[in-house]
Amino acid sequence: MALARPRPRLGDLIEISRFGYAHWAIYVGDGYVVHLAPASEIAGAGAASVLSALTNKAIVKKELLSVVAGGDNYRVNNKHDDRYTPLPSNKIVKRAEELVGQELPYSLTSDNCEHFVNHLRYGVSRSDQVTGAVTTVGVAAGLLAAASLVGILLARSKRERQ
């Protein structure tokens, strides 16, 4: 038995699980979402595919959620409602619809699909995926530096004992 899909409401953020990342869209009614799709997107590759790293432009598209999600799982995820006050749903939808067809700047780190939908819903452009990736890189760099320092100190100690 298949799991029931969530029933989004106007202006809801939709998180679509892709392999290794999430694609984001905003629900605008009648089964449709508005989302930012990199211009390099290949049909069937999924929005914000790995190829999105190669482009600096994206198109705002209005498509059926079922088409954008394909076989991937999705969920309503208004994750910042406790931090930011969402704009009225009619305003979110109006703003999203007005952008359909426009080409916008795109960057994985500063202007991606998550930034886009958060700006529409909250008026705040942010991406937790980017923040998480930067934190992970920072922690990894810190661990590498610490390991290097320990290695240097151990080598120095060994030389001094000889």
From Swiss-Prot:
Q: What's the superkingdom here?
A: Eukaryota
- Active site at H23, H35, C113 (acyl-thioester intermediate)
Alphabetized InterPro entries for the sequence: H-rev107_PLA/AT, LRAT_dom
- PROSITE patterns, per the entry: LRAT
Kindly list the places in or outside the cell where this protein is found, as annotated in its UniProt entry. Answer: Cytoplasm; Membrane
Name the Pfam families for this protein. LRAT
The GO biological-process annotations, alphabetized, read as: lipid catabolic process; N-acylphosphatidylethanolamine metabolic process; phosphatidylethanolamine acyl-chain remodeling
Note the pH dependence of activity. Answer: Optimum pH is 8.
The UniProt record lists the keyword Hydrolase: yes
One GO cellular component, as annotated: cytosol
Q: What does this protein do?
A: Exhibits both phospholipase A1/2 and acyltransferase activities. Shows phospholipase A1 (PLA1) and A2 (PLA2) activity, catalyzing the calcium-independent release of fatty acids from the sn-1 or sn-2 position of glycerophospholipids. For most substrates, PLA1 activity is much higher than PLA2 activity. Shows O-acyltransferase activity, catalyzing the transfer of a fatty acyl group from glycerophospholipid to the hydroxyl group of lysophospholipid.
- Protein name per UniProt: Phospholipase A and acyltransferase 2
Q: What is the lineage of its organism?
A: Eukaryota, Metazoa, Chordata, Craniata, Vertebrata
